[in-house]
A protein has these predicted regions:
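Short, well-ordered turn and helix-capping elements at secondary-structure junctions
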Residues: 17, 73-75, 120
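...with weaker cross-activation on analogous glycine-rich loops/strands in unrelated enzymes
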Residues: 39-102
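Flexible domain-boundary/linker segments
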Residues: 22, 95, 101, 107-109
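Catalytic cysteine-centered active-site loop
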Residues: 11-65, 111
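Short hydrophobic/aromatic patches on the structural cores and recognition surfaces of FHA
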Residues: 29-30, 84, 116
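Intrinsically disordered, low-complexity
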Residues: 1-12, 61, 105-120
Length: 120
């Protein structure tokens, strides 16, 4: 999954984007990676909160590379408002602007942390 995600490093954030031809928003990026990583998963195209509903809760201590990481209140919506792919060692790959590796231990991400999830 991480190998698929790395193909898109540096691509810009585009609201509503869901494929390499349009670029991505956060959930479009994660959905594309899940659907195209070769693990046989299919989540369609959904929101960060929709992806959260397709996952089992994982404690931070049990999070593994490839699990999803969810954040809330990154903009005015209820539930999960941002999603990334946990890569281990306190890092995620996500569609910020651009798609990049980011520490989940910054004050910003720690203040918005909602939880980890593993695709069912």
């Amino acid at each position: 999954m991480i190998e698929e995600a790395e193909k898109y490093l540096g691509m810009p954030y585009v609201w509503g984007g869901s494929s390499p031809s349009t670029s991505f928003d956060c959930s479009g990026f994660v959905c594309w990676v899940i659907n195209n990583c070769g693990n046989g998963w299919s989540v369609g195209r959904t929101t960060a909160n929709g992806l959260r509903g397709k996952c089992s809760y994982i404690s931070p201590a049990d999070a593994q590379p490839g699990d999803l990481i969810f954040f809330e209140k990154t903009y005015n919506t209820t539930g999960a408002s941002h999603v990334g792919i946990y890569v281990g060692d306190g890092m995620m790959i996500h569609c910020g602007d651009p798609i990049s590796y980011t520490s989940i231990n910054s004050n910003y991400w720690k203040s918005h942390f909602l939880g980890f999830g593993r695709i069912n």
